[in-house]
Amino acid sequence: MALAGAGSQLRTLVWSACLCVLVHGQQAQPGQGSDPGRWRQLIQWENNGQVYSLLNSGSEYVPAGPQRGETSSRVLLAGAPQTSQRRSQGGPRRRQAPSLPLPGRVGSDTVRGQTRHPFGFGQVPDNWREVAVGDSTGMARARTSVSQQRHGGSASSSVSASAFATTYRQPSPYPQQFPYPQAPFVNQYENYDPASRTYEQGYVYYRGAGGGMGAGAAAVASAGVIYPFQPRARYEDYGGGGGEEQPEYPAQGFYPAPERPYVPQPQPQPQPQPQPQPQPSDGLDRRYSHSLYNEGTPGFEQAYPDPSTDVSQAPAGAGGTYGGAGDPRLGWYPPYAANVPPEAYVPPRAVEPQPPFRVLEPPYLPVRSSDAPSQGGERNGAQQGRLSVGSVYRPNQNGRGLPDLVPDPNYVQASTYVQRAHLYSLRCAAEEKCLASTAYAPEATDYDLRVLLRFPQRVKNQGTADFLPNRPRHTWEWHSCHQHYHSMDEFSHYDLLDASTGKKVAEGHKASFCLEDSTCDFGNLKRYACTSHTQGLSPGCYDTYNADIDCQWIDITDVQPGNYILKVHVNPKYIVLESDFTNNVVRCNIHYTGRYVSTTNCKIVQS
C-alpha cells in the first residue's frame, strides 16, 4: 500500500510539471508577435556558386517620420558554401566604412566624379529599404549613424555579420554635430542633372585613409573632436565665390588679327662691277686663300666688295616703314600690343653661295704640267676651274662648313729614305700601278731590283666638316692584296721634279688609299675607319701613312743622282671641296747620291 501511494504521488508530480510548462508556453504565445528577434523577411540569391540568405527582423515598409527609440531591427547575412572547405573562425566579413555626409553630394554620386554607379563604391545609403524617397531627415540620420555593436560570432561558419547589416536602430549616445539636410536618394535610372558641388564655410572636413579610417573619422566627428589632419584648401580660399563673383581678370578671347597692309617689295639695285684686283707685292696668288690672308689688306674690299653688306633700302613712298609686309614669310608681323610702334623689317644678310655654285672672275685653275696649254685649253680649263675649284669658305657669313686638308711637311722630312726591293715582293703594289713603266716591260723578271724613294705622309683635316670620299659607296674597289676598299681614285700625287728646270723626272703615280681617322687632337673623337662603309676624315684628326706601306714611295730606279724636289699634293684635282686649296702641297729638297738621300727645307707651298 505504501509503494502504491508513493507511485501515485510521483505520477502526480510529473504531470504537474508538464502542466506548468505547457501553461508557461501558452502564456508566452501572445508576446511572440512583438518579439524583435523574429525573422520577418528572407531573401536568397546565388553568387559564384554560393547561396546567400538575407534575414531581416524588421517590417518591410517603415513609415516616414522620426525614428522610435524603443524599436530595433536586425539584419543577418548568411551564406551556405558549396564546397567542404571551411573558413576561419567567424566566417567571411565584409568591411565597409560608413560614408560621411558631404553637403551637395547626391546619394548615388561616386568619389571620382558625377558618374552614377548603381550601388557601387560603398555609396548606397544604409536605409535603402527603410527610408522613403523624399525624406531628407531620415537620409541624414541614416548616413550619420555609426555602428555601436556587432552581431556575435556564430557557431556555423556560413553565418557572418555584415558591416552595414548589424546596425541596431538605437539612438546615438552622442549628439549629432552636423544636422545638415542631405539630398534624397535618386534612382540610378532617372535622368537628372547633378548639382554643382560646393563647400560650406562652417563645415569641418575630415580626411581618412583607406580601410577603417572612415569609421574612426566618423566616430570622432560625432564626438565633436577635430581630426588631426589639416583640411584641404577650398575653392573659396583662392578667391572663387562659388561662381557668383567674377574674376578680377576676365579670360582672353580669340579675336581676328588685323589685316596687314600690302607694301610692294623694293626692287634690287644693280650691283657695280668688281674692279680688277691689285697686283700683290710678294707675287703670290691669294684669290683662293683663306679669309685670314685678306684681313687688313688695303684695297681688297674695294676690289672684291661683299654683296651681303649692300642691303637695298625701300623707297620712302613705298609703304613707309613696312618692309615687305605683304608676305608673312618676308614681311613684318604687327605687334600684339596696340601702343607699340611698328618696326621696319630688316632682311637677313645674303649668304655667300659655296663652291661650286659661285663663279669668281677671273677663273683660276692650277696647272700641273709645265707646258703651256693652248687657247682652247685655257677656255676649257677656266670652265673646269669654275666648277671644281670653287670659292673659299668664309665662316663669318653663316655658310656651311667645309673640310681643309693640310699635309705635314715635318713628317715627310723626318723619315725619307731609299729602299731596294725585288720585283716579286712588289706584286701587290704592281697591281695598283705604283711602279715605273719599266717594271711592266716584257723583259722584266721577278728578281729585278727596284729603287724606291720612301717617305711617310700625314694629312690633317683642320676644317669644320668631314672630308668624305667622292665616290659612292657601292663603287668602292676592293683590293685583295691590301685587304681594304679604295674609296678615292686620286687622293695624293707623288712627283719628283728637277731642281733646276722643274720638270718631272720620275713618273709619279696616283695613290689610292682608304681614308680613316688614325689619330685625333685632344677633344676630337675618331669616327672613321678603313672599312667598307665608314671611310672619311673627321675635323681635328689625322690620316697617317707610314713609309713602310705599299705605294708610299716613288720609283727612282731610272733616276740619276742629283738634286731634286719632292712634291706631295693632297686632293690634286680638287674633286672634294675644301675651304682652302692653297695649303695642299708640300715641297722638299732632295739630294740623291745613288745610295741614299738627304731631305731638307720641307714646307707648304701653293703649287
UniProtKB/Swiss-Prot annotation:
Cofactor dependency: Cu cation; lysine tyrosylquinone residue
* Annotated site, Cleavage, chain positions: R95, Q96, G134, D135, H151, G152, A217, A218, S370, D371
Per the UniProt entry, the signal peptide is 1-28
Q: Where is this region: Interaction with FBLN5?
A: 334-402
Question: What the entry says about post-translational processing?
Answer: The lysine tyrosylquinone cross-link (LTQ) is generated by condensation of the epsilon-amino group of a lysine with a topaquinone produced by oxidation of tyrosine. Proteolytic processing by a furin-like protease causes removal of N-terminal propeptide resulting in an enzyme largely inactive, but further proteolytic processing by BMP1 results in enzyme activation.
Location in or out of the cell? Secreted, Extracellular space; Secreted, Extracellular space, Extracellular matrix
Cellular component terms (Gene Ontology): collagen-containing extracellular matrix; extracellular matrix; extracellular space
Q: What is the uppermost EC class here?
A: oxidoreductase
Residue ranges annotated as compositionally biased, kind Low complexity, are 82-91
Q: Which InterPro entries match?
A: LOX-like_protein (IPR050912), Lysyl_oxidase (IPR001695), Lysyl_oxidase_CS (IPR019828)
Which residues of this UniProt protein bind Cu cation? Answer: H482, H484, H486
Q: Give the similarity note.
A: Belongs to the lysyl oxidase family.
Put simply, this protein is called: Lysyl oxidase homolog 1
Traced from the root, the source organism's taxonomic lineage reads: Eukaryota, Metazoa, Chordata, Craniata, Vertebrata
Q: Which gene encodes it?
A: Loxl1
